[in-house]
A protein has these predicted regions:
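C-terminal accessory/binding modules appended to enzymatic or scaffolding proteins
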Residues: 312, 358-407, 411
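N-terminal Rossmann-like or analogous alpha/beta NTP/dinucleotide-binding catalytic cores
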Residues: 1-116, 203-216
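Residue-level detector of short coil/turn "hinge" positions at structural boundaries
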Residues: 68-69, 95-96, 218, 253, ...
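Catalytic adenosine-cofactor/nucleotide-binding cores of aminoacyl-tRNA synthetases and other
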Residues: 214-353, 408-437
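Short, histidine-centered active-site or binding-site loop motifs used for metal coordination
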Residues: 7-11, 41-43, 184, 188, ...
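Short amphipathic alpha-helical segments and their helix-coil junctions
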Residues: 1-6, 243, 276-282, 317, ...
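Residue-level signal for inorganic ion chemistry
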Residues: 16, 26, 57, 88, ...
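Active-site cores that bind ATP or allylic diphosphates and position pyrophosphate for catalysis
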Residues: 96, 100-223, 228-234, 242, ...
Length: 437
């Protein structure tokens, strides 16, 4: 069996990290067994679907490296849905309804008032339909036995179908709702595993009966706990979680992937530089039932770790600044975003403004400039400079911080020994002199 998964977004808005996490889970499950990951664009809602959102979804997945083996669009599959709908109708599993939303709301309130579940009440067979009213269509659930399955995350699941309303599958205007087309597609595309959020658990119960009604074996099901942020449930309106915002913040795709792959599991977050390594450790058995908390600070930390551990070859295509492998290795331990390299290159090769210097440090820095000018820079100039300056009686922070500030304009950064050698004699002496004046 070839493991085949799918990610099925609706192009009614941009993706957020909750969507991305679902796409990633499906990609990793397929990748770890050499299977296929598909993209299905759920654009049955022709009024709300937008082509620009389709383009953005594809671009976001491409940026993340989650490239599908194939892409299908539901709007191009209506004939197939019609055929399967007709079969279900002929079998008596689909029936017409004519209630208005207002009538359904009254029915619901009456049931709640009687302390009964607000389940749709089927009309008696043969009940007359009002003239001139276009019907919508419901799938008739089979009440004869419970709906059960072994969920790959939640364990054994059991639903009583009599406590679930027969779902509307088609609107009065003929347009399709989510449930039935999704099942038809999963059958046609030979989907073996459906991984999605726990908010789809009841949908899955209903859809299992649809698979059976269409004479098809269902896929394996896995429902993960939802991703939540400090503000609460994630949504497409939570702008800080959009791919564009994350990219603008300098977040690398594998930092985001590494974090999202482990959120909600018992496994620690381990930053990986490629999806193949990430797939090797992906295990649905480690997922818990509690909501997974998304914290942008954790994304930043994952980004920092990624850059600190990635080799130049692994990150070179993402670097906009012109930088050598040697310089990247020198600087990478002190950046949280690749965009910070540009400022560090100024430290190495640019003209920095003279550092602000305390009066008590001016003579010390003038002496440092004089010593630095006389050193043999083919050796270890930092060690020799520090040793010579200890004769001033300075030590520790009083010795090293004024030098670092004068030479780099910063209070922290890479080790000074390799950094000073890379800055070079002429530039270093000039900066020390400038800071002493």
């Amino acid at each position: 069996m070839t493991v085949t998964t799918r990610f099925a977004p609706s192009p009614t808005g941009r993706l957020h990290v909750g969507n991305i996490r679902t796409a990633l889970h499906n990609y990793l499950l397929a990748a770890q067994s050499g299977g296929r990951f598909l993209l299905r664009i759920d654009d049955t809602d022709l009024e709300r679907s937008r082509e620009e959102h389709v383009i953005a979804i594809v671009a976001d997945l491409d940026w993340l490296g989650l490239v599908p083996a194939a892409t299908v669009r539901q709007s191009e599959r209506f004939e197939m849905y019609e055929r399967e709908f007709d079969k279900l109708r002929a079998d008596g599993r689909v029936y017409a309804c004519t209630e208005t939303p207002e009538e359904l709301d009254i029915q619901r309130k009456i049931l709640l008032g009687r302390k009964l579940p607000p389940i749709y009440t089927r009309k008696p067979e043969g009940a007359p339909a009002p003239e001139g009213v276009a019907p919508h269509w419901r799938f008739m659930l089979d009440y004869s036995s419970p709906i059960e399955w072994d969920d790959l995350v939640r364990g054994h699941q059991k639903f009583e179908p009599a406590l679930i309303s027969d779902p509307v599958i088609r609107r009065a205007d003929g347009s399709w709702l989510y449930l039935l087309p999704s099942v038809i597609d999963d059958i046609d595309l030979a989907i073996t595993h459906v991984l999605r959020g726990e908010d789809h658990v009841t949908n899955s119960a209903v859809q299992l009966q649809m698979f059976a009604a269409l004479g098809a074996a269902p896929p394996m099901l896995a429902h993960t706990a939802l991703l939540v942020a400090e503000e609460g449930k994630l949504s497409k309106r939570l702008g800080s979680s959009g791919v564009d915002e994350l990219k603008a913040a300098g977040i690398e795709p594998m930092a985001l992937n590494s974090l999202l792959a482990r959120l909600g599991t018992s496994q620690p977050v381990e930053v990986r530089t490629n999806l193949e390594e990430l797939a090797e450790g992906f295990d649905l058995a480690t997922f818990g039932r509690a909501p997974a908390h998304f914290d942008f600070g954790e994304v930043e930390e994952a980004n920092r770790k990624l850059l600190h551990h990635a080799s130049y070859g692994e990150i070179a295509n993402a670097i906009l600044a012109e930088i050598s492998a040697e310089d990247y290795e020198l600087l990478k331990g002190n950046i949280s975003r690749l965009s910070e390299l540009e400022q560090w290159l100024l430290v190495l090769d640019g003209d920095l403004p003279a550092a602000e210097t305390a009066d008590e440090d001016r003579a010390f820095l003038a002496q440092a400039a004089s010593i630095a000018a006389d050193l043999d820079w083919s050796g270890e100039p930092w060690a020799e400079l520090a040793a010579a300056l200890k004769a001033t009686g300075r030590k520790g922070k009083a010795l090293f911080l004024p030098l670092r500030r004068a030479l780099t304009g910063r209070d922290s950064g890479p080790e000074m020994a390799p950094l000073l050698k890379r800055i070079g004699k002429d530039r270093a002496v000039a900066r020390l002199n400038a800071a002493s004046n």
